[in-house]
Amino acid sequence: MIKKIFGALIFLSLSTALAFAVDDVPLPEVILTGLQAYSMKGPEAALNAWTKGGPLENDPKVLGSVRVFQEVEKYYGRYNGYNLIRQKKLAPNSKLIYLQMNYEKGPLFIRFLCYFSGDQWVVSGRLVLNTEPDEVLN
């Protein structure tokens, strides 16, 4: 009986660890290009890179997100890099990507809906970003 309980606990522990593991799949080029543009040229360049080739390209509502990044920089300071939280595969050609963008005084959480369109990944849904993780990581 004890062996069965112990075995079940090990199985549950391993299952839980695998469920929350960040996969080793590289980030899509569109995400990396936007992050590099952000660090070198600022939020407008990042948003242009993230939306290039997707349905949100040249959408004025998306470019309105520049103000959000400017507010974050105003209160949180300079951008210092990012951490991948996780990639969640929805289907063979779509996935959600969750990142933590790091600033001097705190993080910004961001979620991208990416779609494999022909031969490349594009950002195909609105960007969800907030300094509160619960607003993004659902």
Please place each PLM-identified region on the residue numbering.
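Short, low-complexity N-terminal intrinsically disordered segments enriched in polar/charged residues
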Residues: 12, 17-40
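Residue-level recognition of short, well-ordered coil/turn positions
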Residues: 42-43, 120
